[in-house]
Amino acid sequence: MRAKLWRWRWKILLGLVLAYLLTIFVLADWLVLTPIPGHVNAGKARRETLTVNGCALECWVCKSAALVDGTPQGYVLEFCGNATRAESIAEYVGDRWKNYPVETWVVNYPGVGGSAGWPRMSNIPPAALGAYDALAARAPDKPIFVEANSLGTTAALCVAARRDVAGCVLHDPLPLKQFILDHYGWWNLWLIAAPVAWRVPSELDSLQNAAHTSAPCVFIIAENDDFVLPKYHEQVIHAYAGEHRSLILHNKGHWDGVGPDTEQELQTDLAWLWANAKQK
């Protein structure tokens, strides 16, 4: 009887260990990225693929309203946030830049949408840098702005710290590793948070990347962000080396966009960014 009880205890312990290892090595990326499967309507956006490290990286492209002659005078490279597909925001991004003759390219990470590969955090840095390089090769003399929201700002800053981007638009940026440890560690005694944070690539260290970015930047900050608390946004802003402005979305949360009440202020900030774009 006692031997049978011990066997059951060992089976339970083994099951817990396997579940823990599954969380660390398999589910960690899913917990952070939460990729959305299936078809997503992209509206009027057109699909393009960039070849990055021999694999197809899917982008959804829109022309701004100001782009009337078909020749873009600049490009915007947008990286999606958590649980977001490029198809869902492509038209929104294009409309944001309506006053500038640009094309906006919104990237689906590897393993998301029509992009090849696996949805892993380790695949984001090479994909983000490869997307910039592929776009720059198409238009070597045109400025490229990087833009992102939330999780996507880690990819945008990864690129901005390593390439000659013209400028950045960062909505609710976060230092991902610190956020995971601080915000999620306490309730699981860091048994889950620490391994998940450990899997965040060093190339996605937003504080280090911000300190090595000289391009001008517009920060968009939700005043009442209760998901990624404003103190995390402030860490990135404080670390940012380049000239920057901050647009505060009053009474807005993490999932809120720029509304009519702040649209004019955003356009003023984009005009400043366009006028002060870093030259290659």
Positions of the model-derived regions?
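Alpha/beta-hydrolase fold nucleophile elbow
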Residues: A139-S150
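Acidic catalytic loop of the alpha/beta-hydrolase fold
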Residues: E223-V228, W255-D256
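Hydrolase active-site cap/lid region
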Residues: C158-N209, G259
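An N-terminal hydrophobic leader/cap segment in hydrolases
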Residues: R9-T51, E58-W60, S64
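Membrane-embedded segments
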Residues: L57-A134, E147, T154
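Short beta-strand/loop motif that positions the catalytic acidic residue
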Residues: H212-S214, V218-D225
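Short alpha-helix in the alpha/beta-hydrolase fold that links the catalytic acid
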Residues: Y92, D205-S206, A215, L229-H238
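C-terminal catalytic histidine-bearing segment of alpha/beta-hydrolase fold enzymes
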Residues: E234, H238-K280
